Amino acid sequence: MKKSLIALTLAALPVAAMADVTLYGTIKAGVETSRSVAHHGAQADRVKTATEIADLGSKIGFKGQEDLGNGLKAIWQLEQKAYVSGTDTGWGNRQSFIGLKGGFGKVRVGRLNSVLKDTGGFNPWEGKSYYLGLSNIAQPEERHVSVRYDSPEFAGFRAVQYVPNDNSGKNHSESYHAGFNYKNSGFFVQYAGFYKRHSYTTEKHQVHRLVGGYDHDALYASVAVQQQDAKLTWRNDNSHNSQTEVAATAAYRFGNVTPRVSYAHGFKGSVYDADNDNTYDQVVVGAEYDFSKRTSALVSAGWLQRGKGTEKFVATVGGVGLRHKF
């Protein structure tokens, strides 16, 4: 009897050790079809059409925490892409970190979402195609190997983040990030910005984004304004590249169905080529149907036009997919 109890206790030890580890993830894939046309003068050339089975951003992760006493906890997460199409591999290629959490907030080190990326709720779309989401305004959003501090919820302040020079990739460009978040009765205001210097193509680069909206019960609505400015290192270019962009998204849940629509516009800014028109308009519409709390069907369509008149690029795309969370 004693031997049986010992064996049972030993068998339970690995389970106890794993008790604070959570396995989670999302599997999502679908079919997308697209058509794009580049217009030059009176001619339409570079016509491209494509239909493909696409992974829509599947992932798998492990996370956990340990109580260290006196209100202090060790926290960790290891998250990676897990494409069902088999086109991506590697560990820790999504948000992965180790850190400490307590009354002071939390400090993490690893591959972390930028503060700017955490304000991307106005772009809820899930698709592989560049045109099935607000990809232009979302372009500066990244994950950095960095150290990040997130404060407790007080006075609206939220986070600061630093990317060291030697962790910024081949460009060797350190960057500084900061943001705040204020919420009250469903209304919210978010700000995020970053400053980067000494990269290969730019001497200085800064982005500022302000997002405001309402998110409560069945209704979500938001407006985002973003301004980018870059001082270029190439002497034969204009001294600055800059652009202001706006985006708006609205969604409302009717039972198991959540339709949504987004619109984005990029105003004409200064670019390396004075003849290059960097204005754009984009519309994405779609809906989700929830079969259960974990499984949903996705359908969406997008349209983008960059430039105007006889010099423009136009793309349309549609997609359907299935998503399961675990």
Curated annotation (Swiss-Prot):
GO cellular component: cell outer membrane; pore complex
Alphabetical list of Gene3D superfamilies matching this protein: Porin (2.40.160.10)
Signal peptide feature range: 1-19
Any single GO BP term: monoatomic ion transmembrane transport
Localization per record: Cell outer membrane
Family: Belongs to the Gram-negative porin family.
UniProt-listed NCBIfam families: porin_porB_Neis
PANTHER family recorded: MAJOR OUTER MEMBRANE PROTEIN P.IA, PROTEIN YDDL-RELATED
Protein name: Major outer membrane protein P.IA
